[in-house]
Every structure is written in C-alpha cells, then in structure tokens.
Amino acid sequence: MAARKWEGPVRRRSRVDFLLNILWIILGGGWLICLEYLAAGALLCLTVVGIPFGLQCFKLAKLGLVPFGHDFDDAPGAGVGSFALNVLWLVVAGVWIFLSHVVLGVGLALTIIGIPFAFQHLKFGMLALAPFGKELQR
C-alpha cells in the first residue's frame, strides 16, 4: 500500500467563519469597505485604462465583505504584466490603501475583541500592496 503524501491542513469554511463574517459586516465596517471598493471599481471601469484596476477593486470588495474563511495566493501564470501593474498600483493607490488598513488594524488590535478584525485588516493591507497576480481561495 502506497503512503499518501501529506498536503497540509485542509481549511473548510466553518460556523465560526460565518459568525465572524456576520460580526465583521455589522461591527467591523465590512459593508462600508465593500461599498468603497465597489464604487472605486465602478469609477475605474468607466475608462479603458482603468478596467484592470477596477477589476482588482472588485476582488478587494468581495474579500472586504466576507474576509473570514478566505485567503489569497499567487495565481499561476502571473508574470511581467502583473508585476508592471502592481508597480503602477503601488505608486498610485496601494501605499495609501495599505496605510489605511494598517491604521485600522492597529486601532482594532488595541481592543481585545477587535484582534480578529485587526488580522483581517492586515490581510487586506498585504493584498492592497500588490493585488495583481493574486487569486482568492476559500
């Protein structure tokens, strides 16, 4: 009998993730973050040049609404184009979005009950630095 290769822990969406997502929407401002990213994405998609950036805003909006139980990883086939768009994104908006999420994360981390939400803001911050070439995973 061949031994199975261990592939790491399998993370499934749990009831805790569901409960934390509900609390995130109500207390953590998840609905506001989602609306901000949706509005920015819609405005960016009005121009041909802004469409790739608008699509990234839509990705961030989805994660902004229900961040618990979701993660992101490098997309297969992400290459030079993703790198170039990430550099442009970083210079134009990425740094400011990152700083806003870090400030919110630190503020939430100061309260005991806000620590799980602080981790989500730090996750947003990392994704906001370079969203191109990343894909969301459950």
Model-derived features: where do they sit?
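Membrane-interface extramembranous regions at the lipid-water interface
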Residues: 2-37, 53-86, 117-138
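Residue-level marker of motif borders
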Residues: 24, 36, 42, 88-89, ...
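Residue-level detector of functionally special positions within alpha-helical transmembrane segments
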Residues: 29-30, 47, 94, 111
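Short hydrophobic membrane-inserting alpha-helices and related fusion/pore-forming segments
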Residues: 42-51, 99-117
